[in-house]
Structure formats: C-alpha cells, structure tokens
Regions:
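Extracellular beta-strand-rich, repetitive "passenger/adhesive" scaffolds
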Residues: 1-349
Length: 349
C-alpha cells in the first residue's frame, strides 16, 4: 500500500467537527498511538469513503466505524477492548495484513457493503452478528481465535447470515459457530487445507466444506432446511443431530466421522436424524461412520464409486428409511433394524 501523502492521526486529537473531520477520498495514517474521536458515521462524507492506514495502535473512541477503508499494516493493531461490542458499519472494508491484528470483545459486521479481509490475526471474544450480505474472508495462514466466554445460551459465539470464506484457521474455544446463509452467492465455505475448530457446528443454510471441521457436536439446531456439501473431513466427536429438517447433506469423497485416531477413522457415538425427511447423498467413496444410528424417514442415495455407511453398534430405521444406489451398509449382526419384522420392514432398499 502506498501511504504517501496520508495525513497523520496522533494522540487524542479529535477529528469529528464540522470544520475538522475525516474527508471522503482522503487518506490518513496512524503511525504511533491514536485514540481521538473521528466522524464515525457518513454525515460529512456525501456518499464517499475515507482511508485509514494503521501502522501503530488505534484504540477507537466510538463503538463503530462507517464508510471507511481501513488497512492494518504489518505490526499495526486495532484494539476495541474498551467496548462491549464494535460494529464495522455500512460501506466499509477492513483489511488486516500479515503481521497486523484486530483485538476486541464482540465484533459485528453490518449488512450493506461490508467486507472484513484477514491476512493476519483476529482475537476476539465473539462475532455474534455477521449480517446479511456481509463477508468475512480469512486467508491462508491467517488465524481467527474466538474465546466465546460468557456468551448467552440463546446466542452463538460466531453467527453469520452473510458469508464466511475460510482458507486459514478459525478456532472457537467455547460456544458455537452457526451459519444461516441462504444465498448461493453468499454462503459458508471452508477451503482446501483450511481448518475450523469449534465445540458446536450448526448447519443452518448453504455451505461447502473442502477442508476440515473439528467439532464436538454437529447439528442443524433442529430447524431450517440447509444444504451442506462435505467434500473432505467433517468430524463430530460426540454427536451428529440433523432433526426437524428436510435438508440435504451432500458428500463427494467426503468423510463424516468422530475423528481420526492412529490413522483410523473413529465412530461418532450418536448419529440422529429426526423423522422429517432429510436426505444424505454419498458419492464417490464417501463414508459415514457412527456407533448408534437413529435414522427414521431418512433417504440415503449413493452414486459413482461405492460409498459406505458403517455402524459399530446399531442402526434404527423408521417409516420409511430409504437406501439406494452404489452403497454398502455395515452393522453388527442382528443390530440392523432390530425388532422390525421381516415381513413388514420400515425401510426400503
């Protein structure tokens, strides 16, 4: 970035007066420390946008920024810890370069024209509202760390109605990551070699996994009709629940299991799908591995090279579980559809 000619912001000097404010089309730079007030709405900008380069440390004095192009340079930092919540508001782009960082409690993204591009480090407690059409991009080798401390039970540590494109590492220490993106052009994507670590992973909209998702629990939060495509590794250490939905899980060379131990896929202890007509498409050597599977009124389809459903304990079917296509089913003898009379099965093969 060329910072030549950028006006320096220093100390606690305020830039929010009618005769002394940040102007659209102009560039500013924070070389050392700055905690003065700025015009944090679009009032003086006439629809334009200003640019702020952060080379030192910026401690904002207001809890939002609007109509801004903010670039955190290598070694630069924005610290919003003094606010319970900080909003990157409409018509704003925040870019964090490699070696730059964003620190805060809760960071939210507004709905109109908001893009957060991370090539460095984000360390926050939560990101509770990444609004419709907003975009969070996490680059290869970039990291997002969300502690998730004291997030209310009805909230998620990270919740997006817009888009998350993760190509680096996204870790949530406590709570849940939920995506509820309903637009095929603005959705959840976990890229090749990318990793997501979260206690709970909630599938609420349109998403694709080409990397690795490590969770203790995967669910759809008993609602919505999501479409999720898993082309790589989707791990649920404790449970997988896909209830109250007619949604679809599509797998292409994908694995849905409890994790990997000594080079072997381990089984999810509990795999449950509510009696609501969900569909699983297993294509080209995909596999689901679980201990106890409860799958009433679920349709399993398989295409391409042979795919596998493997239960290490039992499979319970129900009116009417359907299996079709190039699919193997492995289950301990006598534990498939146990108790269902052979002359009146509640499944179709």
């Amino acid at each position: 970035y060329d910072t030549t000619g950028a006006i320096e912001l220093t100390g606690n000097t305020n830039w929010n007066q009618s005769n002394h404010h940040l102007e659209a089309g102009k560039s500013y730079i924070i070389k050392n420390k700055f905690n003065g007030e700025i015009n944090h709405t679009s009032g003086y900008l006439n629809g334009g946008r200003f640019t702020i380069f952060v080379e030192g440390e910026w401690t904002p004095s207001q809890n939002q920024i609007q109509s801004a192009d903010i670039i955190i340079l290598k070694g630069g930092k924005i610290n919003t810890d003094s606010f319970t919540s900080f909003l990157i508001a409409d018509n704003s782009i925040l870019t964090i370069q490699s070696g730059g960082s964003l620190i805060g409690n809760n960071i939210n993204l507004a709905a109109i024209g908001v893009l957060l591009k991370n090539f460095g480090t984000i360390s926050v407690n939560s990101m509770k509202d990444l609004n419709t059409t907003s975009i969070l991009y996490n680059a290869p080798k970039a990291t997002i760390n969300v502690t998730g401390k004291s997030v209310a039970s009805w909230e998620q540590s990270v919740f997006t109605k817009g888009a998350i494109y993760n190509f680096g590492e996204l870790t949530i220490q406590e709570g849940a990551l939920k995506f509820n993106s309903q637009d095929a052009t603005c959705y959840f994507y976990n890229g090749t070699e990318a990793t997501i670590n979260t206690p709970t992973f909630i599938i609420g909209g349109i998403g694709v996994n080409d990397g690795t998702v490590n969770a203790q629990k995967i669910s759809n939060d008993n609602g919505g009709n999501p479409t999720f495509t898993n082309n790589c590794s989707l791990y649920a250490q404790n449970s997988f629940e896909f209830g109250g939905t007619s949604g679809t899980i599509i797998m292409n060379k994908g694995i849905l299991a409890g994790g990997v131990e000594n080079g072997t896929f381990i089984a999810i202890p509990s795999f449950k799908c509510g009696n609501s007509g969900s569909t699983f498409e297993l294509n080209n050597g995909s596999m689901i591995k679980a201990e106890i599977m409860d799958i009433p009124n679920v349709t399993f389809k398989a295409a391409g090279t042979r795919s596998l459903i493997k239960s290490t304990k039992s499979i319970s079917t129900g009116w009417t579980t359907k299996f079709n296509g190039n699919l193997d089913i492995e289950c301990p003898e006598g534990e498939f559809a146990k108790g269902v009379p052979a002359n009146n099965p509640n499944y179709i093969m």
